[in-house]
C-alpha cells in the first residue's frame, strides 16, 4: 500500500545549513525512516506542486544523552535534501533571501 504523501514528509528542517541551501533551490525535510527516494520525490511533487530533479537522503543516528535518571537516547531521524527544477520554489520559510 502506498502511504499518503503527507505521511511521508513529516516537517521541514529549520537550521542555518538548510537556510543556506535555499539559495541553491535545495529544501531539507524530516521524512519517515522507511521512505525511499522515489516516494519522497512523488510526495514533494504532489504536496507542493513542483518538479523535483534530485533527492539525497541522510540517516542520522540518535545521540546518547545524559538525563537526571541515567542515560537516554534521542530519536534517530532521516532527512531528505530535495533539489527542485529551476524556476520552482516552495514558500515554507519565506523563500531565499527573506
UniProtKB/Swiss-Prot annotation:
One of its GO terms (cellular component) is ribosome. The keyword ATP-binding does not apply. GO terms for biological process: translation. SUPFAM superfamilies: Ribosomal proteins S24e, L23 and L15e (SSF54189). InterPro entries: Nucleotide-bd_a/b_plait_sf (IPR012677), Ribosomal_uL23-like (IPR013025), Ribosomal_uL23/eL15/eS24_sf (IPR012678). Keywords: Ribonucleoprotein, Ribosomal protein, RNA-binding, rRNA-binding. It comes from the Bacteria. One of its GO terms (molecular function) is structural constituent of ribosome. The keyword Zinc does not apply. One of the early assembly proteins it binds 23S rRNA. One of the proteins that surrounds the polypeptide exit tunnel on the outside of the ribosome. Forms the main docking site for trigger factor binding to the ribosome. Part of the 50S ribosomal subunit. Contacts protein L29, and trigger factor when it is bound to the ribosome. Belongs to the universal ribosomal protein uL23 family. PANTHER family: 60S RIBOSOMAL PROTEIN L23A. This is Large ribosomal subunit protein uL23. It comes from Parafrankia sp. (strain EAN1pec).
Amino acid at each position: 500500500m502506498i502511504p499518503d504523501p503527507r505521511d511521508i514528509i513529516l516537517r521541514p528542517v529549520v537550521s542555518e545549513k538548510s537556510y543556506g541551501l535555499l539559495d541553491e533551490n535545495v529544501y531539507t525535510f524530516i521524512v519517515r525512516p522507511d521512505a525511499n527516494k522515489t516516494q519522497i520525490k512523488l510526495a514533494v511533487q504532489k504536496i507542493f506542486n513542483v518538479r523535483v530533479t534530485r533527492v539525497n537522503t541522510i540517516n542520522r543516528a540518535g545521540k546518547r544523552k545524559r538525563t537526571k535518571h541515567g542515560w537516554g537516547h534521542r530519536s534517530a531521524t532521516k532527512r531528505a535534501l530535495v533539489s527542485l527544477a529551476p524556476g520552482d520554489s516552495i514558500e515554507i520559510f519565506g523563500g531565499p533571501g527573506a
